[in-house]
From Swiss-Prot:
Chain residues that bind substrate: 45, 69-73, 127, 192-193
Quaternary organization: Heterotetramer of 2 PyrK and 2 PyrD type B subunits.
Name of the protein in its database record: Dihydroorotate dehydrogenase B (NAD(+)), catalytic subunit
Pfam families: DHO_dh
Catalytic activity: (S)-dihydroorotate + NAD(+) = orotate + NADH + H(+)
Transmembrane segments: none
Gene name linked to the record: pyrD
Localization per record: Cytoplasm
Biological processes, Gene Ontology terms: 'de novo' pyrimidine nucleobase biosynthetic process; 'de novo' UMP biosynthetic process
Amino acid sequence: MERLQISLPGLEMKNPVMPASGCFGFGKEYGQFFDLNQLGAIAIKATTKEARFGNETPRVAETKAGMLNAIGLQNPGLQGVIEQELPRFDDYDVPILANIAGSTMDDYIEVAAELSQQRNVSAIELNISCPNVKQGGIAFGTVPEIAAELTKEVKAVSAVPVYVKLSPNVADIVAIAKAIEKAGADGLAMINTLLGMRIDAKTRRPVLANQYGGLSGAAIKPVALRMIHQVSQQVDIPIIGMGGIQTAEDVIEFLLAGASCIAVGTANFTDPYTCPNIIRDLPHWLDRLEVQSITDLIGGSWNE
């Protein structure tokens, strides 16, 4: 349906809906529920240089309006993804956004250089919420200069467009977004999870083995909307919006805030049909709002 089509750097999308990285595995897990060709794009699970087994359990905890996770970037590593996971997409006609993570800048550069050359990778998503071991564990995405340097280095080696996934756990997300844009990013993805925790009143101990985890789901939607609304008016690159999206109405809100497309995360765990249901319902919302194209809604809430 043409009225749902979105064209972004590296991503020619039949609709503005994709699953968020880390909430859809490598796709095959959800292929048993619906045809993945329905999706606008697929953001796959983070890839690191070496295989990671993740954090100790328990590493997931339910909250009243979402969930906490401290998975620890579990994945088969760069070669495992290239040899085992990416070939599965040969049978699909959907752009693939490959999320990458690392502990050092060199890790990111090596993974981006090789992963971006793979035939099924349409764009790179840079996860800058990871701790930088050479900077005392400070997350790459919390300091504008470091985030910009990482973006510039990855852009220099990537064969495909680069989107940078922003952490909301910062003092000034606009400053970081502008620094990343200046460094050459093709787009942004926001927001990643908010740092949170749960404590078991009976044991008096944190519920997660890692103590703290990323909060996602409906609880963070207002924060995501606010940050996207602020950032989108200060940059000229597209934004993949995410954070608590469950329905087509949520999608409309994110587009009005300034996102160009969206990613569904936690809702995939509670209902594997969330993405196709949203895609089904979007045309009805366009009719209701008397809008011909989904692109007409982008930034519609900005003050003129």
